UniProtKB/Swiss-Prot annotation:
Alphabetical list of CDD domains matching this protein: neurotoxins_LC_scorpion (cd23106)
Domain LCN-type CS-alpha/beta: from-to ranges: 20-85
Cross-referenced Gene3D superfamilies: Knottin, scorpion toxin-like
Domain notes: Has the structural arrangement of an alpha-helix connected to antiparallel beta-sheets by disulfide bonds (CS-alpha/beta).
Effect of residue 6 to M: In CsEv2B and CsEv2D
Gene Ontology BP terms: defense response
Protein's name according to its UniProt entry: Toxin CsEv2
Database matches in PROSITE patterns: LCN_CSAB (PS51863)
Known function: Beta toxins bind voltage-independently at site-4 of sodium channels (Nav) and shift the voltage of activation toward more negative potentials thereby affecting sodium channel activation and promoting spontaneous and repetitive firing. Induces immediate paralysis in crickets after injection, with a total paralysis occurring within 15-30 minutes and lasting for 1-2 hours. Is also lethal to vertebrate (chicks) when injected in very high dosages (more that 100 mg/kg).
Family: Belongs to the long (4 C-C) scorpion toxin superfamily. Sodium channel inhibitor family. Beta subfamily.
Recorded GO CC terms: extracellular region
Gene Ontology terms, MF aspect: sodium channel inhibitor activity; toxin activity
Localisation per UniProt entry: Secreted
C-alpha cells in the first residue's frame, strides 16, 4: 500500500514539473495572443485556463500571453510551418 502511494505521488510530481508552457497562439493566424498590462493579467489567465487551452496559470510577458501547466496537446508559439500573418 505504501509503495502504491509513493508511486502515485511521484507520477503526480513528474506531471507537475514537466508540464508544458509557452505563448498562447491563434491557430488560424499563427500569432501570439497579445496583451498590454504586463505581469498578472486577468485576460491572459482566463485564456490560459479556458477549457480548450487547459493551462493552470497565465500572465502577460513581453506583450503576449504566457501560459504554464498546459497539456501537450495545446499548441504554443511558434506553430510549425506557419508564421504570424497579420492582415
Amino acid at each position: 500500500m505504501n509503495s502504491l502511494l509513493i508511486i502515485t505521488a511521484c507520477l503526480f510530481l513528474i506531471g507537475t514539473v514537466w508540464a508544458k508552457e509557452g505563448y498562447l497562439v491563434n491557430k488560424s493566424t499563427g500569432c501570439k495572443y497579445g496583451c498590454l498590462k504586463l505581469g498578472e493579467n486577468e485576460g491572459c489567465d482566463k485564456e490560459c485556463k479556458a477549457k480548450n487551452q487547459g493551462g493552470s496559470y497565465g500572465y502577460c510577458y513581453a506583450f503576449a500571453c504566457w501560459c504554464e501547466g498546459l497539456p501537450e496537446s495545446t499548441p504554443t508559439y511558434p506553430l510549425p510551418n506557419k508564421s504570424c500573418s497579420r492582415k
